[in-house]
């Protein structure tokens, strides 16, 4: 089965995971590139990707995280698998220094987004490549 990676969209049309990725392009380019590469691999392998690249968030039902490290920073992008729609729904992300504990507020926020997505199935509309760059 092939998975499609999509961004969760809030009722006000904000897309937290996409905003996170944009901020990575400014502040942590290599970390962002690694997260995008892992997201692309998820399209092919889904939850079987493993290898420490994706892990379920055990205390948060249905929530998974993409995990990567670069130059003393850990990037985490939180997502859920929607098996009915063959979607990987990117929800939220954060960066922390190596050795810092997981960000409970960020995990709680992503969990709330996942619950909202399960009710609304709202994702961001596709943006043509040229519009993304402007």
Task: Describe every region a protein language model picked out.
Residues 1-74, 83-87, 94-134:
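Basic, Lys/Arg-enriched alpha-helical interface segments
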